Amino acid sequence: MYKICILGIYFGNLPSYFPLWLESCKYNSTVDFLIINDQNITDLPVNVRQVKMSFNDFRVLVQSKFDFPVSLERPYKICDFKPAFGLICSEYIQGYDFWG
């Protein structure tokens, strides 16, 4: 069976529907989920892992992957980097066949 990891990168207060999202993750037990954020999250399903870091730490991580200046001033601009998530999060997705 293939190993799959879904990345979720979100900074700030989590949306009100977040517990429902976690519940759906639980029922997709053949997929792992990685959440990178700055919140305290408890009671995670076994297939959900959290990497807690500040937005500034994430900016430093992103910049460390590129040899040119990166502009990431606000969390909502993280979506601009989705095509590079595999590179940015490479240390977290080692051993997976697919990531998204």
Give the predicted meaning of each segment.
Residues 38-92:
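Active-site-proximal specificity loops/subdomain of glycosyltransferases
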Residues 1-20:
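N-proximal low-complexity "stem/linker" segments adjacent to membrane-targeting elements
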Residues 19-22, 87-88:
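A generic local structural motif
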